[in-house]
Amino acid sequence: MDIVYAIFTCIVSLLFICVTPVLVLVLRIYVGKTIRNPNYAPVVGTLFHQLFYYNRLYDYQAEVAKKTPTFRLLSPEQSEHYTTDSRNIEHILKTNFGKYSKGKRNQEIIMDLFGEGIFAMDGEKWKQQRKLASFEFSARVLRDFSCTVFRKRAAKLVSKELLMRCSLDSIFKVGFGVDLNCMDGSSGDDNEFIKAFDDANALTYWRYVDPLWKLKRFFNIRSEFFLKKNIKFIREFVDELIRTRRKQLEMKQDSMDKEDILSRFLLESKKDPEKMTDQYLRDIILNFMLAGKDSTANTLSWFFYVLCKNPLIQVKIVEEVREVIGNNMKDNGRVDDFVATITEQVLEKMHYLHATLTETLRLYPAVPVDGRCADADDVLPDGFHIRKGDGVYYMSYAMGRMPYIWGNDAEDFRPERWLKDGIFQPESPFKFIAFHAGPRICLGKDFAYRQMKILSMALLHFFRFKLSDDMKVVTYRTMFTLHINEGLQVCAVPRRGLVEA
C-alpha cells in the first residue's frame, strides 16, 4: 500500500511540476491583453494555436484572414497582430517606419543564426550594410557580371538538374567572388552546408512557437542541440569562405576583385577592423546568403511545380522564348550556344515569363510572414490600436489568397492578371509584398528576377517538365522561407536532341 501511495505521490508531483508552468503561462497570456476592447484587433487564439497548426501554419493564417483581415494571437509578453490589409502594411513599412523596429523578441530568437546581419538589425548597422550592398546591386558591372555567371550555371543546370546548387553557386560567385563549384558534386561539405543551413532556418523559426526554447538552449537538448550543431558548422564554413576571399584579394588573382559584395565589406574592414570584425562579416554573409539562395531556389521550385500543374503555361513560355530569341535557335542545339543568346535586352522582352514568375511569388512568396515591433503606441489605418511592444506581422502567403485583394480568382494561378496588351504591369509593393516594401525593400529584386529568368529559359527551352508523382501532395516546410518539404520531384523530358555544353 505504501508503494502504491508513493507512486501516486510521485505522479501527482510530476503533474504539478508540468502543469503549473503551463497554467502560469496561460495566465500571463490572458492578463492585461485588452481581449474584449473593440479598439484592438479581435483575438482569434494564442501561441498554442500556432503550435497546433504548425505544419500548415500559413494556410491556417490565410483561413483566419479571409474572415478577419487583421487579428491577434496572444503570447506571454505581448499581443501579436497579423494583417493582410495593404494600408496597414504601408503604414508600418513606410508611413510610420520610424515607430517600428525588429523588436527585442525577434532579435532574441534569430540572433544565434543571423547575428548582426541586415535582417536582424535596425539603426546604424542596418544602414551601413544596406548602403554598402546597394552600391553593388546598383552597379552596371554587377548586372553584366551576374548575367555571365547565371548563363554559365544555367548551361550546367540543363545537364545536371541541380536547381538548388545552381542557385547557391551563383550567389557565391556574384555575391562573394568565390567559386563554390557545388554543382560539380566535388565536395560533401557543400551538400552538408545546404542541409545545415535549411535545418538551422527551420529550427530557429520553431522558437516562435516553442515556449521552452530558452530552457532547451540552456540545457542544450532536443531542437536547440541540433540548432547549435548546425550553426557551428555554418559558421566554420563561412569563416573559411572569408579567409579564402581575403587571400584572393591579397594575391590579386581575381580580376573581379572589387565587384562583389564580400569584397566591398572586406575593404571596409581594413578601414575599421575593430567594428568590422570577421564575426560581423560572417553575420553579413549569412544574411545575404539566405536572401539570395532561398528567394531564387525556392521560388523556382514552386515555379516548376505550378508549371507541371499547368502544362499550357509551359507551352506559352517556350513560345515566348522562341519568339524573342528567334526560331534559328533550335531545341537540339548546344546548351552554351543557347544561353549565350540570353542578353539583358532579351530578358526585358520576356513579359509572359516575368508575369509567371511574379504570379508564383504572389501565391508562394519567398518569405511567407514578416513583420515589425511597435516602439510606441500607435493606431493602424484600419482603426485598430497597437500597444508599445506588440508585434505587427504582414502575411505575404495569405495576402496572395485574399479575394478582397486579388478578386474571386485569387487562388487561381493566372499570369495574365499581370499583363495588359502583352506588357507586364507591376502592382503596388504594399499589395504584392514578396520583395518587402518601403525603406527595407529588397535590394536584390532585379538580381533575383534576372537569375530566375535565365535559368527557367534554359530549362524550358530544352525540357518539358512533369511531376514524378501526380498523386503526391506537395506542401511546404514551416520556416522563415517557403521551402518545399522534401524537395520537388520532377521528370524532365527532352524536347528534342540535346548537345551538352
For each predicted feature, which ranges?
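N-terminal membrane-proximal hinge/A-helix region immediately C-terminal to the signal-anchor transmembrane segment
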Residues: 2-124, 128, 147, 151-155, ...
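Conserved cytochrome P450 K-helix E-x-x-R motif and the immediately C-terminal K′/meander segment
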Residues: 47-68, 233-236, 240, 334-382
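Conserved cytochrome P450 catalytic core segment spanning the I/J/K helices
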Residues: 138-140, 201-202, 229-300, 327-346, ...
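Cytochrome P450
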Residues: 2-18, 74-81, 141-149, 156-173, ...
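Central I-helix of cytochrome P450 enzymes
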Residues: 167, 171, 175, 231-238, ...
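Cytochrome P450 heme-binding "Cys pocket" and the immediately downstream C-terminal segment
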Residues: 311-314, 392, 445-483
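Conserved cytochrome P450 K-helix/beta-meander segment immediately N-terminal to the heme-binding cysteine loop
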Residues: 394-423
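Cytochrome P450 heme-thiolate "Cys pocket" and heme-binding signature region
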Residues: 135, 418-452, 477-478
